[in-house]
């Protein structure tokens, strides 16, 4: 796919120094206690001074989230328990006449939340009514409305956000624990001369009585009180909580309510970003308001009817590591409108100026993001069919998202469908798919192994010096690419697992995601 960028209006970032109120209850760690010792205080015994009973058994665990996370960061906005008053988490400027503009902090009365991702709301500030993106609001006076609460994001995603070079030491967020139901985790950026920038994670335990604590000697009636206390006192943490982790506005789910099949006239193509065998990719604007990427397909590339049917499935695939499909123009020439990311394709990024500065930990993290997106595709019983660096898009802070999932199946070009010639990506395709057309999630796993070589070689074409026919013959005879220069043997071993001859013996994307361990994080708790 081509490159993509953010909207013309820069997303506002949320960075605030905390001026917390006095805590109502505190105790304190022993002065001699080190950060590592605070990882899981009293992890194997009941609290000695307790205001209630511990709801979950504290325990250590290092692991990764494999749940169906769909946005990053995710903030719940669903109506529950009759709650109808919500607070705006971000500014929103309307894109259509039926949208409602609002400012961060504005209180909104939800009129109707039964129509999917766009809710009908009434502003208690302006008195106006219109549709709002549901992921831009949270129930009033709830933890979801707190700027430091990031909800169900993964440990790895919290590290990526906190390790932004612009974040000072003590930047923090609170998220749901991945390993203990009902518990939370406090993630804090730190720095030391030996390790450089790193992130420490402190599990927040919950009492049956409703209180919270990191160490049983210091308990609080609410998470807000806990954050307020530790923003004034490090008290055993690596650093006091100095700044809330900044984050950009999330993508809305679609361009607007009912904006799916859109008129061609609503799109303005502004700059060509790339060109392939079957079309072009443009930077553009929808409705004169919204920055988007537009993929234009040459007439005859695929059946408009088949494309529209497939697109209905594709738009339901929503994950933080999948490029979001916004809208389509279904008459030829077909236009595909997607979210617009800032750094273009991963292949161009690796081969460009920025690629020179990427080190192994960053490359492995990018691979883990791709595996996360593909693990979701795997859970949804979908198949990509064309997984390679050219079809991964890169955004700010090295965020990677999978694009073009499912489109390869619809291409009607004779040379492509015959799986031969320059148009077909033989070097990325599993032998059973290239020879017999057996495309499955396991053939995607093979392609992921090839993509790992693209990452570790900064965009080198796989099987250097070999033509397509030779690649097929050699792979059938058992040849596998050797370990790339400066690539760890453990990573090459993972590649070879992806290239096992029997598709059923290849690992799952869930397994691959877990194996791509972070390389720059200090384990403290969770």
From Swiss-Prot:
UniProt modified residues of type Phosphotyrosine: 416
Post-translational modification: The phosphorylated form is termed pp60v-src.
Presence of the UniProt keyword Lipoprotein in the record: yes
Active-site residues per Swiss-Prot or TrEMBL entry: 386
EC top class named in words: transferase
Basic and acidic residues bias spans: 7-25
Residues where ATP binds: 273-281, 295
Region annotated Disordered, chain positions: 1-52
Cited SUPFAM superfamilies: Protein kinase-like (PK-like), SH2 domain, SH3-domain
Covalent lipid sites (N-myristoyl glycine): 2
InterPro entries: Kinase-like_dom_sf (IPR011009), Non-receptor_tyrosine_kinases (IPR050198), Prot_kinase_dom (IPR000719), Protein_kinase_ATP_BS (IPR017441), Ser-Thr/Tyr_kinase_cat_dom (IPR001245), SH2 (IPR000980), SH2_dom_sf (IPR036860), SH3-like_dom_sf (IPR036028)
Keyword flag Transferase: yes
Pfam families for this protein: PK_Tyr_Ser-Thr (PF07714), SH2 (PF00017), SH3_1 (PF00018)
Domain annotation SH2: ranges: 148-245
Function statement: This phosphoprotein, required for both the initiation and the maintenance of neoplastic transformation, is a protein kinase that catalyzes the phosphorylation of tyrosine residues in vitro.
PANTHER family membership: TYROSINE-PROTEIN KINASE (PTHR24418)
Subunit architecture: Homodimer.
Name of the featured protein: Tyrosine-protein kinase transforming protein Src
